């Protein structure tokens, strides 16, 4: 097991050297693992400057690095259309999943009712089901069942599927936040003349909001990056991950690298910016 | 998987006061519950039922791609006899990937929880950030990194450490890809449980046992068990059902059950019942494993 | 009163009439009747689980009584919601809203009542608790003592008819607790509101309250001014919960003028008739440890006495506590003030006489329950 030794907190003199190593071991290992996590991202970035000929797999020293893919990110046919589709699906699925999941979380945490355990299981099992099974089951129902009511594979079937698997993650995130709230805060609000709706909007909701925002970010990234379920229910519709996968055999255009890396950079900037702002507000 | 999320409800109540939660009308609860539950019923439960009925369907003789309702258990028999090795590979690769992910994730989670100080938030963001570059793009990047003329393979070949001479199109590449792709799912729950653990208990452990490793084994690791449990499930389940890594990094000899399901659905005419039987079997195996695992390591926190 | 149509104005004494609160498996408050005069500082004292917090929550409206009525003046508040009552609470864990600044926390109540000058009122309340300089901070940036003051200000700003304090000082360290006790008492005198203070700390209750009610098993054992209650407990439970007592079970066998003569495990002791709540039959004899003197020789002319062997001597600064084993095998406790430069030099094993004025003794009904209390001393006195 390559797990770290924690420091002995008051090490006897003899153990100090070991403790020193153990201390550094965790940090060094952590930095290496982070490097490992970022290595492919680095590759994606580097190959966005590749002046490739047929396929963007090998580095072409002739004319590389080039900025031409960055100057024309929509240059490859279909790449920007798929990005727009993914963004639209991500936004719609996130909004719906956040609403449905937040309501569910409130019911599960704040209320006692018959069927509570069953509801918890209903929320948990989709997370414990492999994506391919979710995709396969949705495909069979969309093709053999819901097609009778006029639902064809495409944009909306992707949206419906994404809402489904995002709900569970929203419930888990919001539930955690709700459970960590001191129930006495609600009592204090009521004691201070707040009616139940006042209590909800002035106290409960603002305190749960960070959890809801986190759930929304999680939902969006899950939806945006989903490939397996999408590939089963998308029909002829193409999302960004599907675009990349399908074009893999012909050769992925470097524009996909440009877009993939930009999404990463934008998300990183947004999150860091957000945490700086919230950090400043706290101070 | 609220081990990811489980936070002790702020129970600081005086023992005299019973639960401050007033018994609310359950009608409101059902109203809150209804939309989400209906959605999960329509797009999760009913499709699963449909998947099950499809898995028992038979083909119309002479009309490929057309099926009739049946109780054709032979589909399951075929799933096992024809694709047994694929099931085996799925479980084996997912198990290996889970183990390697644990080995990589634990030091990182440990450093985040105990050593990172004010860098904690930044490290957390860094763990999640790669997600935003498409998972397919990153997997393709791994193919480039592990390629025969790439840095890893050439280095290992120079040192004569690579028996077959190559990594891509072998099981190693598939396991490496799976490990990489699901690593954050292992890091985050372990980090969450370590962070929640009472640091004073670990200090006390450090006082009781002079040996750092003993402290780790007897105090730190057990306290992070809920996170390890959640992390292994969150890694194993998607890894066992994955087909992208096997498709992009492996060869015909490393195909997993996901690849079979995908091709039976989309590339084999009349493959629906077999694919459905395979999917259903995979789900049953995984749910059974999850159940046994949770029973063995005992946690009610999972729900 | 914008958005608060149900708010009930009420002025006067707080009255609880035959209030009972039952939960599924036990009765937390059992047929409790109580009058708290307007403007008084009232303490509900009792061990955990005695029903004091449940009583408080019923007054606040956070729990509804199973039966009985709760009134302020002539207004019946039973069944009304917390936000409809002219009652505010200082919660045990303070329950400050973490997302609001200190000022917004304090202005929360006035704002909900639609008062235009909510912020001004909040600032005045913060002045009263001497925290105006922290108004813009978030609760997480305050120390425990400061949070406690904000919680007090947040409740006080509403000028409630009754202010409820649920173990408000429990989380503070001893020194800060003493300081806050004085502070709360000052505020109460200044604003003249009815304060109901729930605590399990008998010293705290006695320091602050005009009237103390001792609760046990959902009932009030004894109620009165702190001094009177300490001097003359009427139940064995109170004798031990409010201060310590040397107790012994016995029976009354005779009278001697205005005194009762009791035989307590073979010894004869006297109890003033006025100081005993039982006048015949079984009795629990008691005397406070600080009323008991320790002597090397058998003293004369003081009162009753008993011989014993010193088991433990602990020096506590202003006094020295002696634990003395009396012939029945029980341990008595006695405090001697350290008046002399060289105090009586006693060591464990020394034989001594314990003596007290019989006017200090008291008698309470026998109570099996008292045996569970830590300082109960089953004793036999020898003449």
Regions found by a protein language model. Give the residues of each.
Chain A
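C-terminal transmembrane helix and the adjacent membrane-cytosol boundary/short C-terminal tail
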Residues: 2-13, 24-25, 115, 175-186, ...
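N-terminal signal-anchor/first transmembrane alpha helix
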Residues: 2-47
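Interhelical loop and adjacent transmembrane-helix boundary motif
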Residues: 4-7, 16-23, 55, 66-78, ...
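Transmembrane-helix boundary motif in ABC transporter permease subunits
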Residues: 7-9, 13-19, 91-123, 136, ...
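Membrane-interfacial helix termini and adjacent extracytoplasmic/periplasmic loops
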Residues: 12-16, 58-61, 67, 116, ...
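Transmembrane alpha-helices
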Residues: 28-29, 37-41, 163-164, 170-175, ...
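Hydrophobic alpha-helical transmembrane segments of multipass integral membrane proteins
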Residues: 35, 39, 84, 88-100, ...
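A structural signal for multi-pass alpha-helical bundles of membrane permease subunits
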Residues: 39-53, 85, 134-147, 217-223, ...
């Amino acid at each position: 097991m390559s797990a770290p030794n924690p420091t002995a907190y008051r090490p006897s003199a003899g153990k100090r050297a070991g403790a020193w190593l153990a201390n550094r071991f965790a940090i060094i290992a952590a930095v290496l693992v982070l490097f490992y996590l970022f290595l492919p991202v680095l590759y994606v970035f580097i190959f966005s400057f590749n002046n490739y000929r047929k396929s963007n797999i090998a580095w072409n020293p002739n004319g590389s690095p080039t900025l031409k893919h960055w100057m024309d990110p929509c240059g490859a046919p279909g790449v920007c259309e798929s990005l727009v589709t993914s963004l639209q699906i991500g936004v719609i699925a996130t909004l719906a999943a956040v609403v449905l999941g937040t309501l569910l979380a409130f019911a599960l945490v704040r209320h006692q009712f018959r069927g509570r355990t069953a509801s918890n299981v209903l929320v948990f099992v989709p997370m414990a089901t492999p994506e391919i099974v979710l995709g396969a089951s949705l495909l069979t129902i969309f093709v053999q069942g819901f097609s009778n009511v006029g639902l064809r594979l495409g944009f909306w079937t992707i949206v419906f599927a994404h809402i489904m698997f995002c709900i569970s993650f929203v419930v888990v995130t919001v539930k955690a936040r709700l459970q960590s709230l001191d129930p006495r805060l609600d009592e204090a609000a009521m004691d201070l003349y707040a009616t139940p709706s006042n209590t909800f909007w002035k106290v409960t909701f603002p305190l749960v909001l960070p959890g809801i925002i986190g759930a929304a970010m999680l939902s969006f990234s899950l939806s945006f990056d989903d490939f397996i379920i999408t590939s089963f229910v998308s029909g002829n519709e193409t999302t960004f991950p599907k675009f990349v996968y399908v074009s893999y055999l012909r050769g992925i255009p470097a524009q996909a690298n440009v877009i993939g890396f930009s999404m990463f950079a934008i998300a990183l900037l947004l999150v860091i910016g957000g945490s700086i702002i919230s950090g400043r507000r706290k101070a | 998987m609220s081990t990811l999320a489980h936070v002790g409800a702020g129970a600081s109540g005086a023992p005299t006061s019973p639960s401050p939660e007033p018994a609310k009308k359950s009608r409101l609860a059902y109203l809150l519950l209804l939309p989400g539950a209906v959605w999960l019923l329509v797009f999760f439960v009913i499709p699963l039922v449909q998947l099950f009925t499809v898995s028992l369907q038979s083909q119309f003789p002479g009309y490929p791609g057309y099926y009739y309702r049946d109780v054709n258990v032979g589909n399951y028999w075929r799933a096992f006899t024809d694709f047994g090795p694929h099931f085996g590979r799925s479980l084996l690769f997912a198990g290996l990937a889970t183990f390697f992910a644990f080995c990589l994730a634990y030091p990182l989670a440990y450093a985040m929880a105990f050593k990172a100080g004010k860098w904690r938030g930044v490290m957390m963001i860094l763990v999640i950030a790669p997600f935003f570059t498409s998972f397919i793009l990153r997997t393709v990047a791994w193919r480039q990194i592990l390629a025969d003329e790439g840095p890893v393979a050439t280095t290992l070949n120079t040192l004569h450490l690579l028996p077959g001479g190559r990594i891509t199109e072998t099981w190693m590449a598939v396991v490496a890809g799976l490990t990489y792709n699901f690593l954050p799912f292992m890091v985050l729950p372990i980090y969450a449980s370590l962070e929640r653990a009472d640091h004073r208990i670990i200090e006390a452990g450090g006082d009781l046992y002079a040996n750092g490793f003993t402290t780790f084994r007897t105090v730190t690791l057990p306290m992070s068990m809920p996170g390890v449990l959640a992390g292994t499930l969150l890694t194993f389940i998607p890894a066992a059902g994955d087909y992208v890594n096997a498709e992009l990094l492996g060869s015909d000899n490393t195909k997993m059950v996901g690849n079979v399901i995908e091709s039976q659905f989309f590339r084999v005419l009349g493959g629906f019942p077999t694919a459905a039987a395979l999917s259903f079997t995979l789900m049953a195996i995984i749910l059974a494993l999850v159940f046994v695992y949770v029973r063995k390591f005992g946690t009610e926190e999972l729900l | 009163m914008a958005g608060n149509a149900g708010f009930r104005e009420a002025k006067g004494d707080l009255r609880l009439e035959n209030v009972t609160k039952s939960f599924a498996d036990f009765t937390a408050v059992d047929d409790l009747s109580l009058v708290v005069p307007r403007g008084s500082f009232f303490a509900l004292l009792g061990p955990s689980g005695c029903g004091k917090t449940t009583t408080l929550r019923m007054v606040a409206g956070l729990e509804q009584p199973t039966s009985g009525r709760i009134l302020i003046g002539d207004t019946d508040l039973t069944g009304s919601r917390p936000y409809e009552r002219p009652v505010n609470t200082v919660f045990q864990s303070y329950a400050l809203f973490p997302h609001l600044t200190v000022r917004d926390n304090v202005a929360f109540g006035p704002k909900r009542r639609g008062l235009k000058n909510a912020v001004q009122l909040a600032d005045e309340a913060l002045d009263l608790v001497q925290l105006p300089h922290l108004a813009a901070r978030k609760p997480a940036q305050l120390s425990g003592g400061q949070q406690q003051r904000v919680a007090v200000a947040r409740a006080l700003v509403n000028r409630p008819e009754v202010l409820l304090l649920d173990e408000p000082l429990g989380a503070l360290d001893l020194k800060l607790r003493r300081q806050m006790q004085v502070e709360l008492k000052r505020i109460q005198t200044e604003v003249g509101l009815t304060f109901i203070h729930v605590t399990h700390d008998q010293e705290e209750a006695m320091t602050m309250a005009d009237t103390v009610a001792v609760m046990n098993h959902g009932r009030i054992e004894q109620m009165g001014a702190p001094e009177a209650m300490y001097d003359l407990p009427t139940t064995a439970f109170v004798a031990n919960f409010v201060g310590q007592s040397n107790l012994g079970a016995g029976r009354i066998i005779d009278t001697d003028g205005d005194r009762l003569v009791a035989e307590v495990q073979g010894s004869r002791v006297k109890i003033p008739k006025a100081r005993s709540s039982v006048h015949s039959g079984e009795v629990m004899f008691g005397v406070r440890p600080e009323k008991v003197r320790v002597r090397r020789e058998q003293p004369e002319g003081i009162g009753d006495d008993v011989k014993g062997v010193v088991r433990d001597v602990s020096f506590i600064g202003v006094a020295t506590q002696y634990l003395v084993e009396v012939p029945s095998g029980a341990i008595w406790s006695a405090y001697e003030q350290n008046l002399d430069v060289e105090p009586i030099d006693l060591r464990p094993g020394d034989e001594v006489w314990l003596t007290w004025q019989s006017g200090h003794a008291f008698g309470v009904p026998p109570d099996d329950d008292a045996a569970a209390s830590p300082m109960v001393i089953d004793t036999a006195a020898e003449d």
